[in-house]
A protein has these predicted regions:
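N-terminal accessory beta-strand-rich subdomains and adjacent acidic, glycine-rich linkers
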Residues: 1-185
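An acidic-aromatic substrate-binding cleft motif
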Residues: 161-219
Length: 220
C-alpha cells in the first residue's frame, strides 16, 4: 500500500436504496472515481443463515488482469501476483483474492475490492474464461482438526457462508476507476468503512508484534 496522509477526505457521492419484499434492500453509491453497492437486511429474525451472494462483472472485451491466486480459501495472502488476460482465467483455474486490478485501456484501470467486512467471509473471485468473473465464498466451518504447527484444518463445513444478525448491513462491493496513479491514491475502502468504534485513537502507538516473523526475533 502507498502511505498517504489526509487532513480531510472528500466523501461526496450520489446514493440510491432499492427496497424489496422479504425484508431486504440494496444500496448503491456513485462517486467521482467509482461505484459501490451493498445488501441490507431488515428482517425480524435475530439470526439468519446466508446461503450465498452473487457478484458478477462482465467487461466489453478481453482485458489484462492482475490478481493473486491462492491454492484455496486458507491463505496467508503471500502468493506472487499473476498477470494475464481474462480469457486465460477459467472457472476451474485458481480463484483470486481481493483486490483485483483490470487494465481497461492504456490509461484507465478498474480496481475491484470490498469494504466494511464484519461477521462475514471474505469474497474471492473466479474467472469465466472470457471477459469477466464471479464471486465465490468459503462455507462456515463447523469442525476443526490439527494440521501441523499453529494451524487447523477444516473437517466439516456448513452449507451456508454466514450465520449473522438478521437485521444488518453487509460488506460493500466496489469498483474504483481511474489512471494507475489515481487508483493508488483512491480512498474508497476508507470512505465505505463504518466509523471507528473506539472513539479517540490518539493513545495508540506503534510497537512490537508478538510474532517472530514480524518483530525480528530469532527464537531458534
Amino acid at each position: 500500500a502507498v502511505p498517504l496522509k489526509h487532513s480531510e477526505i472528500d466523501n461526496s457521492y450520489n446514493s440510491m436504496t432499492v427496497s424489496f419484499n422479504g425484508g431486504y434492500e440494496v444500496e448503491f453509491r456513485a462517486f467521482d472515481n467509482g461505484v459501490a453497492h451493498r445488501f441490507i437486511t431488515t428482517g425480524k429474525q435475530p439470526r439468519i443463515e446466508v446461503d450465498g451472494e452473487k457478484f458478477s462483472v462482465a467487461f466489453p472485451s478481453d482485458m489484462k488482469i492482475h490478481l493473486q491466486q491462492p491454492g484455496g480459501f486458507k491463505t496467508a495472502y503471500e502468493e506472487v501476483y499473476s498477470h494475464k488476460n481474462m480469457s486465460e482465467w477459467g472457472y476451474d483455474d485458481r480463484m483470486s483474492t481481493l483486490p483485483v486490478l483490470v487494465e481497461a485501456s492504456d490509461s484507465l484501470c478498474v480496481l475491484v475490492s470490498e469494504s466494511d467486512l464484519s461477521d462475514y467471509p471474505c469474497m474471492f473471485l473466479r474467472g469465466n474464461g472470457a471477459n469477466g468473473f464471479t464471486s465465490v465464498f468459503p462455507k462456515v466451518p463447523l469442525e476443526f482438526g490439527e494440521d501441523g504447527d499453529r494451524s487447523l484444518k477444516i473437517l466439516k463445513e456448513a452449507d451456508y457462508i454466514a450465520e449473522t444478525a438478521g437485521s444488518r448491513t453487509f460488506p460493500w462491493r466496489y469498483m474504483a476507476i481511474g489512471t494507475p496513479k489515481e487508483i493508488l491514491e483512491q480512498t474508497l475502502t476508507c470512505q465505505l468503512a463504518s466509523p471507528s468504534v473506539i472513539g479517540e485513537a490518539g493513545w495508540v502507538r506503534p510497537g512490537f508484534v508478538c510474532w517472530e516473523w514480524w518483530n525480528g526475533a530469532i527464537p531458534y
